[in-house]
Amino acid sequence: MIQPDEPQDFPVKLIDKEQLTPTQIVEQLDKYIIGQKDAKRSVAIALRNRLRRQNVSEELRDEIMPNNIIMIGPTGVGKTEIARRLAKLAKAPFVKVEASKFTEVGYVGRDVESMIRDLVEQAVAMVRSEKTEEVREKAALLVEERLLDILLPPVSGLEESEHVGDEEEAVVVEGDAEVVVEKNLEREINRKSRQKMRERLRDGRMEDRQIELEVSSDGQGGMMQIFGPLGQMEEIGNIMQDLMSGMPKKRKKRRMTIAEARKYLEQEEVQKLIDMDAVVKEALRKVEDSGIVFIDEIDKIAAPTTGAGGKGPDVSREGVQRDLLPIVEGTAVSTKYGVVKTDHVLFIASGAFHVARPSDLIPELQGRFPIRVELKSLTEEDFFLILTQPRNALIKQYRAMLKTEQIDLEFTEEAIREIARTAAKVNETVENIGARRLHTILTNLLEELMFGIPEMVMDGTIDRNIVIDDNQVREKLGKLVADRDLSQYIL
């Protein structure tokens, strides 16, 4: 057998043991998503490969490209949720876009490069949030001092006297000892008053007190939003915002509570403490090394092969695919924060492919998504597990909401199975929208309860322990399921 040469010239580092293994990643995804093991395994391997790439030598690192994934399956089976949860696990910048919203360069609409600009914005916000947490404690102390300065303005002349040197003080003493004693006394009174006020601020006893604060008035803020929706106009909007931000801002005085002033001042102090150049640098690195772009509805830009030749909308669809090619393959995209290389951004595409097929994508784009995973339609048993097992299960959400009204809501196992059976049946007879069907069914099932509970609790006309059984489910939903027209519009 012919073996490739051993990579002796490429030293590697071992991956930190604290990093998630593919098995652990799948276990984490299992907490929120039922089934779809093939898709989970594929994204887990892709995430682990990123860690592996970051630990090889720099020379070889640039040669290792991500294995982009295309997920094929009907709506509501977990495609988007898998990608979103994966990004949270990886603590990576993540953006979800819809392929059908993009247009070919030269047409009115968003161009494909905007997805990378959105990803960079997401990364900057993420890093800024991390840095904010790091400086929040220091910012809180600075805000406290500023609030004390507003509540107890320093007495004129005290600050200067605090910095007087020994020799100068000696001269002052000889000149007028009484003035020095009086200033020292005022300084001590001010210090004690300030300490008492500080304690009251920390205890939260002054949060409702009104103070006057000088704030910047953002007169031009809303003006820039008109540039947003159109492709190239986004760049113009960014340039205009940068120009406006360089102009001196008007300041005006506003009356507000200390609680409101604290939030405003904290934002100001955090901005002063954070080095935005470092934030942008870190954000760009995160995008290039660990960014994830989820392209939904990619089947909408795949033109079915009909033998009619590319005409009408098919030409534009193919144009979008060709515009996507360099982005997915790896190119440099200009953003307002700098140039970003997309060579190692992970792209996960998804589509139902009811009409078109993956083979209807242009061959070059197919080659950029080497891993294909088919997600299965959800069964009645899957619906039952979705309602009971995930940490964010719908039934748990409704129970938590009604707890706020002092109501304990319970579902019998038979009731949950009846809900699952109803969801599966409606998906078969009307249109298969996957797990999203459970939202509409539970909303209709609990509508009267959710509407009338506040008054019934106040009147004492309701049992605090409510149990939903299968008979109630059939009684409430039976007619809707039986009538195809009703279920089509209501469920």
Curated annotation (Swiss-Prot):
Looking up CDD domains in the UniProt record yields: RecA-like_HslU (cd19498)
Compartment annotation: Cytoplasm
Which top-rank group of organisms is this from? Answer: Bacteria
Q: Which Gene3D superfamilies match?
A: 1.10.8.60, DNA helicase RuvA subunit, C-terminal domain (1.10.8.10), P-loop containing nucleotide triphosphate hydrolases (3.40.50.300)
**Short name of any one Pfam family annotated for the protein:** AAA
| Self-association and partners | A double ring-shaped homohexamer of HslV is capped on each side by a ring-shaped HslU homohexamer. The assembly of the HslU/HslV complex is dependent on binding of ATP.
**Protein known as:** ATP-dependent protease ATPase subunit HslU
Gene name, Swiss-Prot/TrEMBL? hslU
